[in-house]
Amino acid sequence: VENIKCRNFGPGMFASYHVYPYYPDSLNYQKDYLENVDENGKINTYSAYLEDLKLAHTIPIIVAEFGIPTSRGMGHESVMGYNQGKVDENAQGEMLVHMFQCIKDAKYAGGIAFTWQDEWFKRTWNNVMFDIADRRPFWSNIQTTEQCFGLLSFDPGKFDVTCHVDGDVSDREGVVPIIQ
């Protein structure tokens, strides 16, 4: 991208990447990544990868997607424990904060958490044969590691959804917010 010459292009150029802590698998095996430890003495392959990625560009970089799914199934395991699945929602929140801090510490131009709300249309190799493709968007599949990334979920209840996004907060009474 740096080699594209632009005239009268005030905004400039930037690079964007999807950077997840569990993929590519080399994050679990690359020696220098495994030797990268944070201030708490924990292995941090994510920040090592971010630093390496910066070497490919002289323009600003935005992490256009980063996240962790809370699916029951697991597609990739991370040496950091930041797995693609088998993570509870509290851990997901803590991991998102940590990944964003890594992005900031690496002096990236920004990061965008994936995703605001769960996407039910996603599928994965481990269960694609067990769903009906044209009906996939209509039901959540907790097994699918490409779902359950959302900060906001739309979980079905026994007879109705458990929470309506309609401005009436009475269905959330007694729920302690994560942040205010």
In which residue ranges do the predicted regions lie?
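Short, acidic/polar
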Residues: V1-C6, Y46, N90-C102
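Glycoside hydrolase catalytic-domain groove-lining segments
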Residues: E2-G81
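Generic secretory/membrane-interface signal
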Residues: G10-G12, I59, M95, A113, ...
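Short loop/turn motifs at secondary-structure junctions
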Residues: P11, K107-Y108
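Broad hydrophobic/π-residue packing in well-ordered secondary structure
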Residues: H18-Y20, F66, M95, I112-W116, ...
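A short acidic, glycine-rich active-site loop
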Residues: V37-D38, N83-Q92
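Aromatic-rich peripheral "rim/lid" segments of glycoside hydrolase catalytic domains that contact
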Residues: S78-G81, A91, C102-K107, A113-P177
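Surface-exposed, glycine/proline- and aromatic-rich loop segments on solvent-exposed faces
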Residues: Q180
